Regions:
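C-terminal ends of transmembrane helices
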Residues: 1, 52-61, 82-92, 145-157, ...
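Membrane-water interface at loop-to-transmembrane-helix junctions
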Residues: 2-13, 32-42, 155-184
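Hydrophobic core segments of alpha-helical transmembrane domains in multi-pass membrane transport
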Residues: 12-23, 43-51, 136-145, 173-182, ...
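Hydrophobic alpha-helical transmembrane segments in multi-pass integral membrane proteins
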Residues: 16-28, 112-120, 178-186, 213-220, ...
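Membrane-interface helix termini and inter-helical loops of multi-pass transporters
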Residues: 25-36, 118-127, 156-157, 188-190
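Entry/N-cap segments of selected transmembrane alpha helices
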Residues: 30-49, 127-136, 168-176, 254-269
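Membrane-interfacial helix-loop connectors
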Residues: 75-77, 83-93, 101-111, 119-123, ...
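C-terminal transmembrane helix pair
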Residues: 112-116, 130, 224-279
Length: 279
C-alpha cells in the first residue's frame, strides 16, 4: 500500500469512529427512512468489502491470475473493473478474451456479494430472499467456469484501481444510498409495490449495492414484501449486466462485447426466467 492509500484508510477509520457515536440513531424525513447512523453503517459495510479486495489487489494484483483478478475486481467494483479492462482492450484488442473472462468473473462475485449484503443488514429475511438469488448466482458461476474452460490466456497485471476508502467515494455512496432508500420508500407509499421495479431499473445503472441494502432494510422492517425485495434486487442486477455490456462495447471493442454479451445474455435469460417462474 502506498502512503496515500494508508492515509485514506486511516482518515476513513478515524472519521467513522468520530462520526458514528454522534450521529442520531433515529429515522426522519417524510417517509421515516433516513437514519443517519444507519446510512453511515451502510457506507462502512460497502467500503469494508471493497477495501478487503483493494488490499488483496495491492498484495497480489501485480501477478494476479485470471480467476484472482476477477474475484478482486468483483470485491472492489465489478463496474469499475469492466471499465478498466474495456479501456485496456481498446489499447490492445488481443486482450479481449482475457478481459471478457475477468469481467464475467467479477460480475459473478458481484452476484454473490448482494447475498452477503442482505445477510449483513437484514438476516431475518435471508431465508426467503436468498434461494432465487443463489440460483441466479450459480448460473453466473456456471458461465464463469464455461468461459474459463474455453480461454487459455494467462492473467497479467490488473489495471490500477481506486482506493474505496477515499472519503469522496464513501460520501458519494452514502448520498446514493440515502437517495435510493428515500425514493424506494416514497414510490412504495405513493404508488404501491409495483413502482419499486421502476426504481430497480434505474438503480441498476447507478449502484446495485445501494438498491440491495435499501430494499433489504425496508423488507426487514416489513415496509416491502419479501418477494418484491428479491425481485427488485435481481432486476437491478440484470440491468447492471446490460450496462456493463454497453461499457464493453463503447469503451472496449465489438469482440469484447460479443464475448461478454454471450455470457451475460444467458445470465439475463436465466434471471428473467427466475423472475417469472419462481414460486
Amino acid at each position: 500500500l502506498s502512503e496515500r492509500d494508508v492515509q485514506a484508510v486511516m482518515r476513513f477509520v478515524i472519521i467513522s469512529l468520530i462520526i458514528l457515536p454522534v450521529l442520531p440513531d433515529e429515522a426522519f424525513g417524510p417517509h421515516l427512512v433516513l437514519n443517519p447512523r444507519e446510512i453511515w453503517w451502510m457506507v462502512v459495510l460497502i467500503v469494508g468489502i471493497g477495501l478487503a479486495g483493494y488490499v488483496s489487489y495491492k498484495l497480489f494484483g501485480g501477478g494476479a491470475g485470471v480467476v484472482l483478478a476477477g474475484i478482486l475486481g468483483g470485491l472492489i467494483s465489478s463496474t469499475a473493473t469492466t471499465v478498466a479492462y474495456a479501456r485496456r482492450v481498446k489499447e490492445n484488442p488481443e486482450a479481449a478474451s482475457l478481459a471478457a473472462v475477468i469481467i464475467v468473473i467479477a460480475s459473478t462475485v458481484a452476484a454473490a456479494r448482494v447475498i452477503v449484503e442482505v445477510a449483513a443488514v437484514a438476516p431475518s429475511i435471508l431465508g426467503a430472499v436468498a434461494p432465487p438469488l443463489v440460483a441466479w448466482c450459480l448460473l453466473m458461476v456456471l458461465m464463469s467456469i464455461t468461459m474459463l474452460m474455453f480461454d487459455k490466456t494467462q492473467g497479467d497485471a490488473m489495471p490500477e484501481q481506486e482506493n474505496p476508502a477515499e472519503l469522496k467515494s464513501a460520501l458519494i455512496f452514502g448520498a446514493v444510498y440515502a437517495l435510493i432508500i428515500f425514493a424506494t420508500a416514497a414510490a412504495k407509499d405513493y404508488f404501491g409495490g409495483q413502482a419499486l421495479y421502476g426504481i430497480a431499473l434505474v438503480s441498476g445503472f447507478v449502484d446495485v449495492d445501494a438498491i440491495t441494502l435499501s430494499t433489504a432494510r425496508l423488507a426487514a422492517a416489513q415496509r416491502v414484501e419479501v418477494t418484491t425485495a428479491w425481485q427488485v434486487i435481481l432486476i437491478a442486477s440484470l440491468v447492471n449486466l446490460v450496462f456493463k455490456a454497453g461499457v464493453a462495447l463503447t469503451l472496449g471493442s465489438a469482440q469484447l462485447f460479443l464475448r461478454v454479451a454471450s455470457a451475460f445474455g444467458v445470465a439475463i435469460a436465466g434471471g428473467v426466467t427466475i423472475l417469472v417462474a419462481w414460486p
